[in-house]
C-alpha cells in the first residue's frame, strides 16, 4: 500500500514538474510575442525568419472568438464571446495550418488564453458571428448562462483576495472556475488547442482566479500531441499572468507551484537599470535576490503588450521600442543572462494606447512588409527582426547553459561578463566611453561583434574583437555609438 502511494505521489510530481518545461526544440531559445499578427503571416515568419534565426517559440494573440468593438482596439481580443477559433487573425483551419508549419521548422506555439471572464456589456456580436447578452450573462456560443458566473461586483480593493478573484475586472463578466461545467468547457477549449499541436499557454488574468481551480483545470489537460514532434508524456508549458509588485493580498508564490508566472518585477527592474535610475554594476546578482520568482518559474521580458502602453505594472520605467538604444541594451542583457525564460516583444507602432493593429480597411489586419535589412514597415515594429535582438537569440543558443563568469564593472554603468568560455558581452550606459582590457573567457582569435554586425563567411559586417591567448581583449564602446552593447560568441569567430 505504501509503495502504491509512493508511485502515485511520484507520478503526480512528474506531472507537476512537466508544466515548467518549455517544450522547446533542442538548441533553440527565446520566445517572441507576435502581437496581433495573422495566422498565415506567423506561419510564413516561422519558416522564413524565426526558424532560420534560432527562435524557439511564438506567443500568439487570443485565438477564440471575441467581441467586435468600435474602432477595433487591441483589447477586444480579451473580450471572449465563445471558444470558436475565429478572430481577425484567422479561422481554425488557418490556425491549425500555422501550428503545423511552425512545429515543422522547430518553432513552438503558445496561446494567450482568456478564461477568467467573458465580454463586458456592449460586447454583443462576435468575430465568428455569435451573439451574446453580457448584461444578462448569456453567451450561447459556448453556451454559458448566468448560472456559470460569479455575482456582479467590482474590484476596488487589491488587498482583498476574495474581491480580486470573485468580482469583475473592469466590467468583464467573471466566470466561476469552481463550477464543474465551467471547468469542463475551459478544459475542452484548451485540449482542442493541444490536439492542434500547441506547446503551451499564457493564462490571462490568472491572478483573478483561485489557484485551486486552476490546478483542477491544468490537471485535466491532455499530454501534448506527439504527431507534432513532442515527446510522449509531454505536458503544456503554462505561464500565468500574475502581476505581483508586492504589497497586495495576492502573491505570485500562490501560483508558482502550478506553472511559471509573468515576472513583471524583471520588466520594472531592467527598465530602471537601463534608464539610468539604478547603476548597472548592481546587476551582478540579477535573479531571485531581486525579488523574482525562481528561474524556471519566471517568464521574463523587457516590456509586454500591456505595460508598453502604461497598463499593468512598471509605469514610466518600462522600456519600449520608442527608446531604441536602451531597449536594445536591456534586451541584449536579458538574452545574454541565464535567468528565466525570455520573451521578446514584437509590437505594432501606436500613438493611442487603445489603437489596434494596422489594417487594410479599418477592419482587416494588414500583413507586415519587410525591408532588405530584415526590418518591418507598414506600421509594424518587429523588434524581433532588429539585428541587435535576433543576433542575441543566436548568442543565447551558442552559450547554452554555461554559467556567468568573469564579471567586470567600473563601479558604475559599464559592465561585462562571459558565459563560460562560449560567449562574452559588454555594456556601456555611462555618458563617457568604455575603453578597457577585459577578461572574455573565450579562446584566442578574432570575433565578430553580433550587435554592430553579423558574421558573413570569414568576414564581419560590424566591429571585430581580438581575444589574446590569455583570454583578454580590448573592449571599446563609445558613449555616442548607436548601440551601447557589444557581444561575441564562439559561433561568431572569424
Swiss-Prot record:
Residues bound to chloride: 202, 304, 343
Keywords on record: Calcium, Carbohydrate metabolism, Chloride, Disulfide bond, Glycosidase, Hydrolase, Metal-binding, Signal
Signal peptide segment: 1-18
Residues the UniProt record annotates as site (Transition state stabilizer): 306
Disulfide bonds: 46-102, 153-167, 376-382, 448-460
Enzyme Commission designation: 3.2.1.1
Origin superkingdom: Eukaryota
GO function term, MF aspect, one: metal ion binding
Stretch list, region Disordered: 350-370
Keyword Calcium: yes
Pfam families the record matches: Alpha-amylase, Alpha-amylase_C
GO biological process, one term: carbohydrate metabolic process
SUPFAM superfamilies hit by this protein: (Trans)glycosidases (SSF51445), Glycosyl hydrolase domain (SSF51011)
Subunit structure, as described in the record: Monomer.
Protein name as it appears in the record: Alpha-amylase 2
Name of the encoding gene: Amy58
Amino acid at each position: 500500500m505504501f509503495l502504491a502511494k509512493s508511485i502515485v505521489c511520484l507520478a503526480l510530481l512528474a506531472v507537476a514538474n512537466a508544466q515548467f518545461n518549455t517544450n522547446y526544440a533542442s538548441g533553440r531559445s527565446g520566445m517572441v510575442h507576435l502581437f496581433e499578427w495573422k495566422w498565415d503571416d506567423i506561419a510564413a515568419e516561422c519558416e522564413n525568419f524565426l526558424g532560420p534565426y534560432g527562435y524557439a517559440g511564438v506567443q500568439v494573440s487570443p485565438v477564440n472568438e471575441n467581441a467586435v468593438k468600435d474602432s477595433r482596439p487591441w483589447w477586444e481580443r480579451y473580450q471572449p464571446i465563445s471558444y470558436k477559433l475565429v478572430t481577425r487573425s484567422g479561422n481554425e483551419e488557418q490556425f491549425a495550418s500555422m501550428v503545423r508549419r511552425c512545429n515543422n521548422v522547430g518553432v513552438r506555439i503558445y496561446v494567450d488564453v482568456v478564461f477568467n471572464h467573458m465580454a463586458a456589456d456592449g460586447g454583443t456580436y462576435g468575430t465568428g458571428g455569435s451573439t451574446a447578452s453580457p448584461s444578462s450573462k448569456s453567451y450561447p456560443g459556448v453556451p454559458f448562462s448566468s448560472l456559470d458566473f460569479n455575482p456582479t461586483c467590482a474590484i476596488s480593493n487589491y488587498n482583498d483576495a476574495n474581491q480580486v478573484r470573485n468580482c469583475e475586472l473592469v466590467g468583464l463578466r467573471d466566470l466561476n472556475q469552481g463550477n464543474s461545467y465551467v471547468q469542463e468547457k475551459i478544459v475542452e477549449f484548451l485540449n482542442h488547442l493541444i490536439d492542434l499541436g500547441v506547446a503551451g499557454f499564457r493564462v490571462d488574468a490568472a491572478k483573478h482566479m483561485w489557484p485551486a481551480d486552476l490546478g483542477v483545470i491544468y490537471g485535466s489537460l491532455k499530454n501534448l500531441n506527439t504527431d507534432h514532434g513532442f515527446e510522449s508524456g509531454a505536458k503544456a508549458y503554462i505561464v500565468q499572468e500574475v502581476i505581483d509588485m508586492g504589497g497586495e493580498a495576492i502573491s505570485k508564490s500562490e501560483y508558482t507551484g502550478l506553472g511559471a508566472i509573468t515576472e513583471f518585477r524583471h520588466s520594472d527592474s531592467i527598465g530602471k537599470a537601463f534608464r539610468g535610475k539604478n547603476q548597472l554594476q548592481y546587476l551582478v546578482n540579477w535573479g531571485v535576490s531581486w525579488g523574482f520568482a525562481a528561474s524556471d518559474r519566471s517568464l521574463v521580458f523587457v516590456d509586454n503588450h500591456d505595460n508598453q502602453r502604461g497598463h499593468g505594472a512598471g509605469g514610466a520605467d518600462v522600456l519600449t521600442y520608442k527608446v531604441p538604444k536602451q531597449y536594445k541594451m536591456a534586451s541584449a542583457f536579458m538574452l545574454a543572462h541565464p535567468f528565466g525564460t525570455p520573451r521578446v516583444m514584437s509590437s505594432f507602432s501606436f500613438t493611442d494606447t487603445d489603437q489596434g493593429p494596422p489594417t487594410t480597411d479599418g477592419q482587416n489586419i494588414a500583413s507586415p512588409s519587410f525591408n532588405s535589412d530584415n526590418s518591418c514597415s507598414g506600421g509594424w515594429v518587429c523588434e524581433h527582426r532588429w539585428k541587435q535582438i535576433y543576433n542575441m537569440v543566436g548568442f543565447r543558443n551558442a552559450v547554452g547553459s554555461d554559467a556567468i563568469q568573469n564579471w567586470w564593472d567600473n563601479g558604475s554603468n559599464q559592465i561585462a561578463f562571459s558565459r563560460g568560455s562560449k560567449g562574452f558581452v559588454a555594456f556601456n550606459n555611462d555618458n563617457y566611453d568604455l575603453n578597457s582590457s577585459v577578461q572574455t573567457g573565450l579562446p584566442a582569435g578574432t570575433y565578430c561583434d553580433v550587435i554592430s554586425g553579423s558574421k558573413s563567411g570569414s568576414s564581419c559586417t560590424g566591429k571585430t574583437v581580438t581575444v589574446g591567448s590569455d583570454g583578454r581583449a580590448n573592449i571599446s564602446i563609445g558613449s555616442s555609438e548607436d548601440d551601447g552593447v557589444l557581444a561575441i560568441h564562439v559561433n561568431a569567430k572569424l
